Regions:
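Secreted/periplasmic carbohydrate-active enzymes, especially glycoside hydrolases
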Residues: 1-221, 225-229
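Solvent-exposed loop/turn segments at secondary-structure junctions
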Residues: 213-215, 235-238
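Active-site-adjacent "subsite" loops/lids of carbohydrate-active enzymes
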Residues: 171-172, 236-241
Length: 241
């Protein structure tokens, strides 16, 4: 039972070890909850204004609630060049849930705002904002709170040149496996921190997750310290000896 059918599709040039190698956890949610969210934080054509777009999937199961409220807070450090503290509030009625139904029991609520001035994220200046999403019931009680770091950035290719926030960049990258010489595919957070700091000391600005999505914490570190990520899907086959 070491391998499944999927093992041969997700089969890279790699040490093939068995066992649970990343965090596994069980958690409970209220019947009405934040099922998922997706945030897109870009820049306008002049690379000054921030374009904040957020989609929140609200799961309410079989029974439509009468009224819900979503609150979204967005802010950065007070000492930032362009400090902001935004609070977006949206009251959600039964009809809103019906009109925005994604599938049975789940509806998507959208937020969008143009922010006059933002501190853009780049490898040289990895500016991040704190985003918090609160779901409240009809009495104003907090049902669930989730959050994420957000970086405003725009990536594009113009005239054959890769640009971030309108500025040309030179990729100085490495490939990285989720692998530790002592613990195999179980990589500690401390080792990830050591990896990323070593990369920065050698002026590396890009990492390729060869050949599969990495641990979630690794992406958080790349956001925090300023590394571009070439993220690969776990879809590659090789012969096994």
């Amino acid at each position: 039972y070491r391998f499944s059918d999927g093992s041969y599709l997700e089969c890279q040039d790699y040490w093939r070890m068995s066992g649970i190698t990343r965090d596994v956890f069980i958690y409970s949610k209220p019947k009405t909850n934040i099922y998922d969210f997706f945030v897109k934080a870009g820049l306008d054509n002049n690379y000054r204004k921030g374009i904040f777009e957020l989609s929140v999937d609200v799961n309410y199961g079989k029974k439509l609630p009468s009224v819900l409220t979503l609150e979204v807070a967005l802010s950065n450090d007070e000492g930032s060049k362009n400090h902001i503290e935004k609070l977006y509030t949206k009251e959600i009625t039964k009809q809103d849930l019906i009109d925005n139904q994604k599938r049975d029991g789940v509806s998507t609520i959208h937020f969008k705002d143009i922010i006059e001035r933002v501190d853009a994220w780049s490898a040289e200046k990895p500016n991040l904002y704190d985003m918090t999403i609160r779901l409240k019931d009809k009495k104003g009680n907090v049902v669930e709170v989730v959050g994420s770091k957000v970086g405003f950035r725009t990536t594009e290719v113009k005239d054959g040149q890769l640009k971030v926030n309108g500025k040309p960049i030179l990729i100085k990258g490495v490939n990285r496996h989720d692998h530790d010489g002592n613990t195999g595919q179980c990589v500690s957070r401390e080792m990830m921190e050591k990896d990323i700091k070593l990369m920065l000391q050698h002026n590396i600005n890009t990492v390729r997750t060869s050949h599969y999505p990495n641990d979630v914490y690794w992406y958080e570190l790349c956001d925090k310290y300023g590394l571009y990520v070439i993220d690969e899907a776990n879809n590659e086959s090789h012969a096994q000896g």
